Amino acid sequence: MAGPASVAGDVFVDALPYFDQGYDATGVREAAAALVEEETRRYRPTKNYLSYLPTPDFSAFETEIMRNEFERLAARQPMELLSMKRYELPAPSSGQKNDMTAWQDCVNNSMAQLEHQAVRIENLELMAQYGTNAWKMSNDNLALMIENSQKELQNVRKEIQDLNWQRKNDQLAGGAKLRELESNWVSLVSKNYEIERAIVQLENEVAQMKQQQGDENKENIRQDF
């Protein structure tokens, strides 16, 4: 249950869930849900609250390759197989057997393929030499990150628990104070009722005494005459 909002926009909550009773009573949850539903029906938005924003452009970050791939998927076409042509070493065709340029292109292609394989071998050797330690260091870094995250998580959980305990203590103290004030209010109301009843009784007695005195005065006057 929330009170009125302040100037700063904060909402003052006057519910004491750690102290209040009756939340689990039959029909309470249904009644609360009915109140929420009734309020949402009365305050449904009457216009598009995003109307001040421009129309979203979902293709703003699409590239030509992405668009082609989307079109392929929409057409349910299979993906093109990976071309292995650049790894082939074809000899010049029968019509180019005497063409030096064709043979030079074949030699250049062979040299490129050889260099590519040499680079692959170097990478494998480097991985064999340093890969194990690099992998161990990466695992150690991940373990350290996990440990730090676990510590941070424990700290956050402790802060949440401390906050909940503080909230519970404050609510129980506030509830006890409210109960004391309620008891004092009931006592004061009872005393006021007793005082009012005594006043009414005294007023009745005074009225009776006045009436009796008036009757006696009338009787004395009548006897004098």
From Swiss-Prot:
Q: Name one GO biological process term.
A: mRNA splicing, via spliceosome
Q: Where in the cell is it found?
A: Nucleus
Top-level taxon in the UniProt lineage = Eukaryota
Q: Per the database entry, which stretches of residues form a coiled coil? A: 138-222
- Record flagged with keyword Transferase: no
| Chief localisation class | nucleus
This protein's GO cellular component annotations are:
catalytic step 2 spliceosome; nucleus; Prp19 complex; U2-type catalytic step 2 spliceosome
Alphabetized, the UniProt keywords read: Coiled coil, mRNA processing, mRNA splicing, Nucleus, Spliceosome
Q: Which Pfam families match?
A: BCAS2 (PF05700)
Q: Is the Ribosomal protein keyword given for this protein? A: no
Cite the record's note on assembly. Component of the pre-catalytic and catalytic spliceosome complexes. Component of the postcatalytic spliceosome P complex.
Family membership noted in the UniProt record: Belongs to the SPF27 family.
Q: What does this protein do?
A: Required for pre-mRNA splicing as component of the activated spliceosome. May have a scaffolding role in the spliceosome assembly as it contacts all other components of the core complex.
Which PANTHER family does this chain map to? BCAS2 PROTEIN, PRE-MRNA-SPLICING FACTOR SPF27
From the Swiss-Prot or TrEMBL record, give the protein name.
Answer: Pre-mRNA-splicing factor SPF27
Q: Which gene encodes it?
A: bcas2
